[in-house]
Swiss-Prot record:
Required cofactor(s): Mg(2+)
Source organism of the structure: Francisella tularensis subsp. tularensis (strain SCHU S4 / Schu 4)
Protein name: Phosphoglucosamine mutase
Function of the molecule: Catalyzes the conversion of glucosamine-6-phosphate to glucosamine-1-phosphate.
Catalysed reaction, written as an equation: alpha-D-glucosamine 1-phosphate = D-glucosamine 6-phosphate
Modified residues (Phosphoserine): 101
Length: 443
């Protein structure tokens, strides 16, 4: 089990967890030293979201990198996918983002990309962790790294998207966008302006403390309300670092990451093409059944966009994502990208010329009940054997009417209990039964 890294980088409450100035400096120094060992380019890219702690954590990271002799290019406040994009474009050894994504402002963290724009694999994360626990290393002969700021860093990313989709996007509807007071603030607006979109922007005034507060992709009620008030045709909601996207149709009804994947699958020619879709263990069974009925290959990965990416590469597919709104298109990028996904959707809606609600999967989705059970410590997968017989009992009762998923959180001591069934009360009753068993045997 990893010591510092979770399923999406390193994350925690600032000053009261791993996320301290001291640790962040050591992380920068460890990665810098590893870059030297492997003879990678002595150059990295950094960015951040809008949290009040982002500045001092970034400079702690930079000091550790500079001490190891690594040059740093600072993009400032930009969405996470922009850092991945620029890391590849500028041939940097690595890319860092100071962000805690959809978490509250008191949390922060570090996402780390390798030179190919992918998140680090488990083996490389272990190497970094070993280096963190070693000595702090100064580059000999005072050959320390430099620090530079790149103004208007978003421009290269916007131009890349525009050159690919200008011929497809001609959307005439009214759009409301929720930037979660995060990294998409002003950046997403610049992208929409480039395409001439008629939009109203909400939650786009970050003050360092309001990121994700009552807004963004994890608080969809905000965009639903705004779409109705504005009589808009579409709502687009991003999270704090803009790697997630949830949309809302003209009736204020949510379309989550699974629904977005289904839209992209129907119009994959506009999105560069794909010979299959990767979802996750959380993907609603209704979508899996729909893909099979339409002869679209479908694979379930573990939850986490890094695992979606691994299976995209493994099976040679191009499009995948999660219910939570991480959507990856390998025809363009290497990580979940809310801004690029939004433009893909606007291209599709422009070409198809029908209401957004008509793109949704027809019929009722399977009903899901998800309960997060707090634990006293992180649970390992082998610990789940203690409730294996209880899970088996529920699966027998469900038969072919549903399924069960128990999943430890990758970032906190929580076990997620999910039951899916064709009836909501059945799903809820069986989920509550399993929660009681978990509390008896694991808490």
């Amino acid at each position: 089990m990893a010591k510092y890294f979770g399923t999406d980088g390193i994350r925690g409450e600032v000053a009261n967890s791993t996320i301290t100035v001291e640790f962040t400096q050591k992380l920068g120094n460890a990665v810098g030293s590893l870059i030297n060992q492997k003879n990678y380019p002595k150059f990295v890219i950094v960015g951040q979201d809008t949290r009040s702690s982002g500045g001092f954590l970034k400079f702690a990271l930079v000091s550790g990198l500079n001490a190891a002799g690594i040059d740093v290019l600072d993009l400032g406040v930009v969405p996470t996918p922009v850092v991945a994009f620029m890391t590849v474009k500028h041939r940097a050894a690595a890319g860092f983002v100071i962000t805690a994504s959809h978490n509250k402002f008191t949390d922060n963290g570090i996402k780390l990309f390798s030179s190919n724009g992918f998140k680090l694999d488990d083996a490389l994360e272990e190497e970094v962790e070993d280096m963190i626990d070693g000595d702090f290393i100064y580059q000999p002969q005072f050959k320390f790294g430099s620090y530079k700021i790149l103004a208007n860093a978003i421009d290269e990313y916007i131009e890349s998207i525009y050159s690919r989709f200008a011929k497809f996007v001609n959307y005439k509807g009214k759009v409301v966008v929720d930037c979660a007071h995060g990294a998409a603030s002003h950046n997403f607006e610049a992208l929409l302006d480039k395409f001439g979109i008629n939009y109203v922007s909400i939650a786009s005034n970050p003050d360092g403390l309001n990121i994700n507060v009552g807004c963004g992709a994890t608080c969809v009620s905000n965009i639903k309300k705004a779409v109705k008030e504005q009589k808009a045709d579409l709502g687009i909601s991003l999270d704090g670092d803009a790697d997630r996207i949830i949309i809302v149709d003209e009736n204020g009804q949510e379309i989550d990451g699974d629904g977005i994947l289904n839209i992209l699958a129907q119009y994959s020619d506009i999105c560069g093409g794909t010979n299959g879709i990767v979802g996750t263990q959380m993907t609603n069974m209704s979508y899996e059944n729909h893909y099979r009925a339409n002869k679209i290959p479908f694979i379930r990965s573990k939850v986490g966009d890094r695992y979606v990416l691994e299976d995209l590469v493994k099976y040679g597919y191009k499009i995948g994502g999660e219910s939570s709104g991480h959507v990856i298109n390998l025809n363009f990028g290497t990580t979940g990208d809310g801004l690029f996904t939004a433009i893909q959707l606007l291209a599709i809606f422009s070409q198809a010329d029908k209401p957004v609600s008509e793109f949704k999967l027809q019929g009722e989705l399977m009903q899901q009940t998800l309960i997060n059970v707090p634990l006293t410590k992180k649970v390992a997968r082998e610990d789940l054997q203690k409730v294996a017989s209880d899970v088996n009992d529920v699966e027998k009762r469900l038969g072919n009417r549903g399924r069960v998923l128990l999943r430890p959180s990758g970032t906190e001591p929580v076990l997620r209990v999910m039951v899916e069934a064709d009836d909501k009360s059945l799903a809820t009753n069986e989920a509550e039964y399993l929660v009681e068993k978990v509390k008896q045997k694991l808490v």
